[in-house]
């Protein structure tokens, strides 16, 4: 079965939203989304992990039903990939060594396979291995990118095993297989899947720290020489800011709106003033001092920032991330957060999806909320749908029923027409070489260091962390 005929179904368990997507893949592996649907998590997901199994199953059931509506007739989702990024997820380094014959020998495929086999026997108390990254090889104590074919006396492989509490997989399995009757095709580590569709080859080669500030969690993935060097997940995110703002006698939704529309991480002229908010009833209004609101939000964002920078500091990899910090997630959308971080650290850039990972002719690919599910679909390898055949009598009955229903120009009708057109175009493309304008790749080069290094800037950030984002924070506190 070709990739374009295979449909992948993925679910991303976010603390704020649970999101689902069905997608195909182009022949070159690029993801082509078919449809996307999301629902509020309603507190059934806490810090990225399933808390209320029944509520999570009910939400996923509704998402699956909506996704099925946009599939071809008689095609239904029968299995799911589920992405997780909860607080118990972390990388564990696992080192395997193999002594060669005393006189030394050339490393062969079977030597490398024996290291993988020994790694598969690794176990951790109360933890389950969700994923394993490609290893970093050391030949006679020296790092080697391509170990096969090298003469040595000792071969070492350093794996990064991604582990989580056993209950993480158990709760997902119960929700998907027992409650919904679907097959759990695989559990994918969301931060790693996101990195595959966001980080460029240059960023991976130079080394970088990919940070996603989500609603309930903040993931920190550090890459060195194209390989994962460390993964940690913090149990805090943008939702903590929202919850702090509820202390102003606001509902969570009102606090969320305030966070997105009125909070700023840099003091400016507006910070000295005030603003008015209209509440859900559309009638009542209240006035808020910008300095008070910003002070609450800044305190929590300071804490989140301090924690992920501390993970980077403790990793010992400060001088190995030539591409700096790559920021993503809803928490980074707070006004001026990105500008504040650039002011302090310099080497900070917003994450951008790679054009060679998505179908650039598909508008759904470019919606920011889809990044996680696109990453999951990119990682997926097994088909997730089945085609249910219909006998001739049922088919005639369905056609007659459809003819009796007047056509309406609804969104679903237009979507179906669009999918039919797309299928015809894909059939035509199969017979010809598809030409595509590739976006020129901007090579990331290490800049000549004329000032403080990234590590020096980070140390400076810790020294002045009492007023991380600007020099006026202390003035705010005295008002």
From Swiss-Prot:
Alphabetic keyword roster: Cell cycle, Cell division, Cell inner membrane, Cell membrane, Membrane
UniProt xrefs under SMART domains: FtsA (SM00842)
Region described as Disordered: 417-458
Gene3D superfamilies reported in the protein's UniProt record: 3.30.420.40
Subcellular location as annotated: Cell inner membrane
Spans through the membrane: none
Keyword Cell cycle: yes
PANTHER family listed in its UniProt record: CELL DIVISION PROTEIN FTSA, CELL DIVISION PROTEIN FTSA-RELATED
Family per similarity comment: Belongs to the FtsA/MreB family.
Record's protein name: Cell division protein FtsA
Classification of source organism: Bacteria, Pseudomonadati, Bacteroidota, Bacteroidia, Bacteroidales
